[in-house]
Every structure is written in C-alpha cells, then in structure tokens.
C-alpha cells in the first residue's frame, strides 16, 4: 500500500440534489458485471456519436514471465508504474467527463477504503478545471446505482481522511439514483444532461 501526503482541507457540502426514477431492469440479472455494464454503456454512446468515453488503461511494468508452453505466456510478477487516478474519462458535448466506478455488497454504506487520496486529489483538480467529475456507486445486494458528484465525495473524505464508510443515506441525499435500462444499461449521461447541463445543480 502506498501512502500519499494529505493537503486537502475540510469543506461543507451545500448543494441541492435530485434523484431520478428507478427502472426495474437490472444488468446483473443478465449476467453482466457492473464494469461490463458501464463499458457496454460507453460503447452504446460511442456507436451513436453521443459521447466518447473510454476506460483508462493501467500502466503496468512486467517483471517476470513464465512459459509453461511454447504457445502460452504467463505473467507471474508485475508492478504498477504509477498510481491510477480514475477509471474513465472522455468528452460529452464539449465537456470533459471523468469518473470512478465502485461496487459493494454492503447494504448500508460504501467503504471509503475503496478510494485513495491521490484519486481524491485528481478529482479536485478536474473540478478546478471545470470538468464534470463524479463516481458511480453500485450496491449489488440492493441492485441500486448512484451518481455522486465528486464534490460530495471530496467533502465526505475530508471529514476524517476517508477512514469511515460513506452511509447510503448520505449518498441518496447528495447523489442521483441511476435508472437501469436495456440500452444503455447505465445511462449516467441522463443525470449530467438533466442536472448539470441546463439543470439547476450548482
């Protein structure tokens, strides 16, 4: 585990949030993982020229490779070249979009150990440059997904440096429920369109 210096200060969330209606369609019932559903959603947006959003590659340094068979190589040792920031980034209607996706089986909270300081700092930098930054939080047991603006995540993290889990009530109050769909499966751009581009979220 890598420790990073902390230089963020506490902030207070003072925003008005809305929730969208929930649809009963669930990608998990179709055998898809949360990440696969997001990737399929991004493919849908790309194929219809709605947005260009991709999963960021993780830079890895391969150290050792075994060859159990001549036609097959097995990586047995590798290291991350640098700390990752967020999972996805791209552009939508001229706006830079950057977000992280997390999943938990817990019913009452999202573990903050899933978030690292360098990710929080990266999100703060994106917001400083007026980018659209958020996290998609999926509660697999509840079959509920939420769009939480990055500022709400940052503010909660700064209370105790991310040592406590984030209650689902906080997420529901400060975020937006994402209505599952067939195409796309996780229509998070609807949240952006309705509440950030021409909406009343500040």
From Swiss-Prot:
Lineage: superkingdom: Bacteria
Cross-referenced InterPro entries: Resolv_RecU (IPR004612), Restrct_endonuc-II-like (IPR011335), tRNA_endonuc-like_dom_sf (IPR011856)
Cofactor descriptive note: Binds 1 Mg(2+) ion per subunit.
Entry keyword Secreted: no
Residues at the site labelled Transition state stabilizer: 102
EC class name: hydrolase
Subcellular location: Cytoplasm
Pfam families to which the protein is assigned, alphabetical: RecU
Binding locations of Mg(2+): 85, 87, 100, 119
Chief location category: cytoplasm
CDD domains for this protein: RecU-like
Gene Ontology terms for molecular function: endonuclease activity; magnesium ion binding; nucleic acid binding
Keyword presence, DNA damage: yes
Catalytic activity annotation: Endonucleolytic cleavage at a junction such as a reciprocal single-stranded crossover between two homologous DNA duplexes (Holliday junction)
Gene Ontology BP, a term: DNA recombination
Function text: Endonuclease that resolves Holliday junction intermediates in genetic recombination. Cleaves mobile four-strand junctions by introducing symmetrical nicks in paired strands. Promotes annealing of linear ssDNA with homologous dsDNA. Required for DNA repair, homologous recombination and chromosome segregation.
Name recorded for this polypeptide: Holliday junction resolvase RecU
